[in-house]
């Protein structure tokens, strides 16, 4: 199975990416995680992106807040799918990061999840890898079924409370 590459712009993004890593681990997906800044370590970020395919990555996730140029900087240097996670920062509740991540020029796409959407970034990565991996697809189906069962259990409890 190909790996997922995870890059964060700062260690302040780590709490969000721990959820990403936990989700990938629960699905048996290998990953690597690094801190590279689009502004402070642009050469390292570029080198990571350029060599990602040769290093066995199938999908890349880039998380950053505020100016949030990391996902775009990674996407500019690879044709692998890049998923951007805009991270909530000290102002604007992450809307600044969301707009910086989603507003990419034509020809350099970045798939973008919600602000602080680390779990969905992992699940989107898994869905992409599952296109060619039936075992992973089955794990995703099982996860969705378990999530649905939890909702139905909560509904049953609510109905019992209201009608009981």
Predicted regions and their residues:
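Short glycine/serine/threonine-rich phosphate/pyrophosphate-binding segments
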Residues: 13-17, 41-45, 64-73, 92-95, ...
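Glycine-rich phosphate-binding loop
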Residues: 48-86
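N-terminal beta-loop-helix "entrance" segment that forms/cooperates
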Residues: 33-54
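Active-site nucleophile and cofactor-binding loops and adjacent substrate-binding regions
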Residues: 37-38, 63-67, 86, 112-117
């Amino acid at each position: 199975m190909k790996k997922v590459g995870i890059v964060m712009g700062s260690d302040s993004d780590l709490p969000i990416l721990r959820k990403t890593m936990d989700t990938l681990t629960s699905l048996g997906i290998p990953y690597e995680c690094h801190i590279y800044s689009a502004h402070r370590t642009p050469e390292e970020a570029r080198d990571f992106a350029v060599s990602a395919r040769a290093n066995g990555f199938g999908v890349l996730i880039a998380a950053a807040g505020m100016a949030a140029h990391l996902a775009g900087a990674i996407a500019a240097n690879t044709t692998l799918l890049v998923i951007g996670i805009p991270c909530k920062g000290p102002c604007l509740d992450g809307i600044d990061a969301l707009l910086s991540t989603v507003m990419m020029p034509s020809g350099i796409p970045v798939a973008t999840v919600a602000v602080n959407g680390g779990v969905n970034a992992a699940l989107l990565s898994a869905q992409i890898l599952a296109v060619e991996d039936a075992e992973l697809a089955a794990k995703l189906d099982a996860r969705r079924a378990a999530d649905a069962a939890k909702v139905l259990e909560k509904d049953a409890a609510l109905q019992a409370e209201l009608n009981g």
